[in-house]
């Protein structure tokens, strides 16, 4: 059974924990409480399998605190990560500026492929859903960008996340197959 480690990173108060709880069907949190360091959520998704035989997959979603005071812990969090989801609040301009730092640190410096990264522009309840006006500078404009609004269309983000998990598992399966073939040859 394949086990994938996915990091949820991004600025403070961007909605990482709310999204992580929703996507893993964990408990809801009603009051804001900043994540201290990291929370690890383990889950399985029946829609994601590692091959045509329907072998299940396990996931660890690492909900990482966005405060810079945890920066010294980031190398340990990044170890053996298979994917990175950068969550930001699309309504806060400073979050857009910070995204390049998150991308550089968690994706580029870890030699992850862009396909292993997804951006989520999270819209908090009552903020409106302005999907059209978000322009990102290179290299962020090459990444998969998904808007999430748990109030108006929660299933859209769930379906996009499942697609993302499937791509991570496919990549892991292909890598494992290549490794097995190299051992046999």
UniProtKB/Swiss-Prot annotation:
The keyword Lipid biosynthesis does not apply. The modification Phosphoserine is found at residue 137. Keywords: Cell projection, Cilium, GTP-binding, Nucleotide-binding, Phosphoprotein. SUPFAM superfamilies: P-loop containing nucleoside triphosphate hydrolases. It comes from the Eukaryota. It comes from Macaca fascicularis (Crab-eating macaque). The keyword Magnesium does not apply. It is found in: Cell projection, Cilium. One of its GO terms (molecular function) is GTP binding. Belongs to the small GTPase superfamily. Rab family. InterPro entries: P-loop_NTPase. Small GTPase-like component of the intraflagellar transport (IFT) complex B. GO terms for cellular component: centrosome; cilium; intraciliary transport particle B. The lineage of its organism: Eukaryota, Metazoa, Chordata, Craniata, Vertebrata. Its main location: other. Pfam families: Roc. Component of the IFT complex B, at least composed of IFT20, IFT22, IFT25, IFT27, IFT46, IFT52, TRAF3IP1/IFT54, IFT57, IFT74, IFT80, IFT81, and IFT88. Interacts with IFT88. Interacts with CFAP61. GTP binds at residues 10-17, 63-67, 123-126. This is Intraflagellar transport protein 22 homolog.
């Amino acid at each position: 059974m394949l086990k994938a480690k996915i990091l949820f990173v991004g600025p403070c108060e961007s909605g990482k924990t709310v999204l992580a709880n929703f996507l893993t069907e964990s408990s809801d949190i009603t009051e804001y409480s900043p994540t201290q360091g990291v929370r690890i959520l383990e889950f399985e998704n029946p829609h994601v399998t590692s091959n045509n035989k329907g072998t299940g997959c396990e996931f660890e979603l690492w909900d990482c605190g966005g405060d810079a005071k945890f920066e010294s812990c980031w190398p340990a969090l990044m170890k053996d990560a298979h994917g990175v989801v950068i969550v930001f609040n699309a309504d806060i301009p400073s979050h857009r500026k910070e995204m390049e730092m998150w991308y550089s640190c968690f994706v580029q410096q870890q030699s992850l492929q862009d396909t292993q990264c997804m951006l989520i522009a999270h819209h908090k309840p009552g903020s409106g859903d302005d999907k059209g006006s978000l322009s990102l500078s290179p290299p962020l404009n090459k990444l998969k960008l998904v808007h999430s609004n748990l109030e108006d269309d929660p299933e859209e983000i769930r379906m996009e996340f499942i697609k993302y998990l499937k791509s991570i598992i496919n990549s892991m399966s292909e890598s494992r197959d290549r490794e097995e073939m190299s051992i046999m040859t």
